[in-house]
């Protein structure tokens, strides 16, 4: 009987000593989980009749809006500071990344142009070209034409390299001579000109001059016969025998080889044969004439030219040429690199201002508040539990160890009592 009593006593003492460490370990290990659940549970308010039970809903669901504001202030004040946002922007906007993005956009734009079935890009380009020739370029030309040296170098170069060395070829001289003799001064025009010239007064002047200024045999002929009767008869012949007179004039032109002589003379025409002073004056006159014309009529000329051009068709041709241009494809990388460098220089100067202007526009703090408020208490609890289990397991273990140590301390106190 004494042995049974002793065994019971030893078991009771052992249980008294072992229970506090075991209970402390269990309580310490599961305290975090219980505490988290107590913060969130219940998720919604519990009512008895019209009265809400105290401590419902849980602490976090009840103060979720204030918690969202605190989280937003903490993140914006400690994590996403303006300086950190600037560093983030610098990392995102590195030259290589910006260049790659610009190159991608350029390639995308070219591909969009190639896939444009309605020729929208060509229509836009046509409107730009039409405005350029009808409005912008005439105004620019009118403003530039006021300068004294406007197009001076260009006109002088054209004059020296083109006009100064210009000569008619044999074919051009032949065509020009034929045009002069057949259209400008044909035999009929010569006949009528001769009739208009041989007036009575002109015949008298010619006759008197011939009598006064001749000598020797010619003086005898001039004073005995004179030219008056001959010229009058020539005029009468041209008036009365028109067809025959035209034939005779044509024969005279052929016999005198006027066509060949005229062709040779046209071929010999060249500004280089003129004196240097004359050439200089002619160049100056040409420059002033061109400048004066541009000042007075250049704008109207460009406007009229723009109205007569089919800009839509020209734009389509330009776009088709660009789509198959190897130079455009190879130059995209260079263009993107230059644009990236320009953007980098701009950001170096104004990145702080840009970030300061972007923060209110982005409203990151409000985004955080909205996201926290939009998250249900269940999801918040699951997120915190996941963080505790994956990242803060050491705290849970320490809680168990501390609970065990507290239990051991209590057991020691019980033994000494």
Curated annotation (Swiss-Prot):
Give the subcellular location: Cell inner membrane
Keyword Membrane listed? The answer is yes
Where are its TM segments located? 11-31, 395-415
Membrane topology label? Multi-pass membrane protein
Output the Gene Ontology cellular-component terms.
Answer: plasma membrane
Keyword vocabulary terms for this entry = Cell inner membrane, Cell membrane, Membrane, Transmembrane, Transmembrane helix
Record-stated family? Belongs to the UPF0754 family.
- UniProt name for this protein: UPF0754 membrane protein PCC8801_0398
Q: What species is given as this protein's source?
A: Rippkaea orientalis (strain PCC 8801 / RF-1) (Cyanothece sp. (strain PCC 8801))
């Amino acid at each position: 009987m004494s042995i049974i009593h002793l065994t019971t006593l030893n078991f009771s003492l052992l249980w008294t000593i072992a229970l506090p460490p075991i209970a402390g370990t269990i309580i310490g290990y599961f305290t975090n989980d219980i505490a988290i659940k107590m913060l969130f549970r219940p998720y919604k308010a519990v009512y008895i009749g019209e009265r809400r039970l105290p401590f419902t809903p849980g602490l976090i669901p009840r103060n979720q809006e204030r918690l969202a504001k605190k989280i937003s202030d903490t993140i914006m004040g400690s994590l996403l500071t303006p300086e950190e946002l600037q560093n983030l922007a610098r990392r995102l906007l590195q030259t290589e990344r910006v260049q790659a993005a610009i190159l991608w956009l350029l390639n995308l734009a070219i591909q969009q142009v190639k896939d444009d079935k309605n020729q929208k890009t060509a229509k836009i380009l046509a409107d730009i070209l039409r405005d350029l020739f009808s409005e912008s370029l005439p105004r620019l030309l009118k403003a530039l034409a006021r300068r004294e040296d406007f197009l001076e170098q260009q006109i002088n170069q054209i004059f020296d390299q083109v006009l100064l060395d210009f000569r008619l070829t044999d074919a051009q001289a032949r065509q020009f001579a034929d045009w002069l003799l057949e259209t400008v001064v044909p035999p009929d025009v010569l006949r009528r000109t001769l009739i208009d010239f041989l007036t009575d007064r002109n015949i008298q002047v010619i006759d008197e001059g011939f009598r006064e200024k001749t000598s020797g045999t010619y003086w005898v002929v001039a004073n005995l016969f004179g030219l008056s009767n001959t010229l009058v008869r020539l005029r009468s012949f041209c008036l009365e025998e028109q067809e025959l007179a035209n034939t005779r004039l044509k024969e005279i032109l052929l016999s005198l080889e006027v066509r060949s002589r005229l062709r040779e003379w046209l071929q010999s025409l060249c500004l280089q044969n003129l004196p240097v002073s004359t050439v200089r004056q002619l160049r100056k006159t040409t420059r002033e004439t061109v400048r004066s014309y541009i000042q007075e009529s250049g704008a109207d000329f460009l406007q009229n030219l723009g109205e007569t051009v089919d800009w839509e068709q020209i734009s389509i041709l330009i776009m088709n040429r660009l789509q198959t241009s190897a130079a455009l494809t190879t130059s995209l990388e260079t263009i993107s690199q230059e644009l990236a460098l320009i953007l980098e220089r701009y950001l170096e100067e104004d990145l702080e201002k840009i970030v300061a202007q972007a923060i209110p526009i982005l409203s990151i703090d409000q985004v955080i508040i909205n996201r926290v408020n939009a998250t249900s208490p269940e999801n918040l609890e699951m997120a915190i539990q996941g963080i505790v289990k994956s990242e803060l397991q050491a705290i849970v273990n320490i809680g168990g160890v501390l609970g065990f140590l507290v239990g051991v301390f209590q057991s020691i106190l019980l033994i000494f009592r």
